[in-house]
Amino acid sequence: YALALIGCDDYRSTTPPWLLYNFPKIENVIKFLCNTPCADGCDYCRNALDVHKGLKKIFGFDNFRTYNGEPLQEMAARAAVEGKSLLAVFPTGGGKSITFQLPALMAGKATHGLTVVISPLQSLMKDQVDNLAEKGIEDAVTVNGMLNPIERADALDRVASGKASILYISPEQLRSKTIERLLMSRNIVRFVIDEAHCFSAWGQDFRVDYLYIGDFIRKLQKEKKTDKKPIPVSCFTATA
């Protein structure tokens, strides 16, 4: 089953929910086969796992930004492509969005996976989805209270059908059974917490669902019955 999905020409094809239910470890098999570098000279590794080639192909940039001589963008993007969890602190306007969007779009093509981005502001989610669309990238959607019923249904359908590789939601959306069922039906490759300082700034007595994020990820992992290896998490902030 894993080889059949990997060999599909349409990267938007998804693993059927019945297959995920009956063979939950198929997600790990796909991730292992598609994300494990093999030997030097491998065409697949050069094209699917190289962050520089991904940056050029997807966004049209030749190089990542550096800060005080440090390649922070590249380091964060590479760590995500390698399947690691990470915390990254970037200066305001420092281009942190591309460091999680790039690995998410690469994973969407390589493993047919979905990256869930948890963001505090509806306007911020819309801006990021719109900015990607302006670049011709239609792989991102948002589900939030600004959508009318038709727009919400379309967004949910795009995620369920595999047309979306990035889903932007607020932490409150994790309480929704619709969202929970939706995420159960997809191969979740990573959770991204944007503006991660909200954990401590807000999570105690304002927007307490920030404190629910960890519980939800553990619950999802348990219900998916994949293995003991946790779903990777990336935390990004401009405020440490």
Q: What residue ranges belong to the model's regions?
A:
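Short, intrinsically disordered, charge-balanced linker/junction segments flanking boundaries
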Residues: Y1, K56-F59, L156, F236-A240
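Conserved pre-motif I regulatory segment
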Residues: G41-P91
